[in-house]
Regions:
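Short acidic linear motifs
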Residues: 1-150
Length: 150
């Protein structure tokens, strides 16, 4: 009877080194258990860091290192690549707005690789600076990525 009135303690998890692969596996598990109406972006903090307290039960740990996740594409980056997560979100939002405005992809006409045209995005006032890397658009889902299609 006494157990009914005892407060349940939150489980504490050790802080340890977690690889990117382990983190991705934990996120996959977390995603599979999410209700359909709850987006994965609930796992991403405002500064694009990952909410480790939500993932701790899947990792059985709290990662030492800081990982970042794009809210737009859900790509994951380590601390040295934080700028990529920020630039991906920035550019993906602009690409989505461009498609909404023009019903076209913001690429140079005839480009077989579908490289994002920063010029077209700037011309429409959708971006104010050009990210230092090239992004490519997937023709199926219109998500951008860093991989040049073959």
């Amino acid at each position: 009877l006494w157990r009914l009135f005892k407060k349940k303690r939150k489980k504490t998890y050790p802080v340890k080194d977690v690889s990117l692969h382990e983190l991705k596996q934990a996120i996959r598990q977390y995603m599979n258990e999410l209700p359909d109406h709850v987006p994965l972006s609930m796992l991403i903090n405002e500064d694009l860091t990952i909410n480790y307290h939500e993932l701790a039960p899947y990792l059985n740990a709290i990662p030492i290192q800081t990982y970042y996740m794009s809210k737009e594409t859900y790509d994951i980056f380590d601390e040295t690549q934080r700028h990529l997560a920020e630039d991906l979100d920035y550019t993906q939002r602009a690409v989505d707005q461009y498609i909404d405005l023009t019903s076209e992809l913001p690429v140079i006409h005839g480009d077989p690789y579908l490289k994002v045209s920063y010029h077209k995005l700037m011309k429409r006032g959708l971006i104010t600076y050009r990210p230092p890397h090239e992004f490519f658009i997937d023709p199926k889902d219109h998500l951008i990525n860093l991989k040049k299609p073959k």
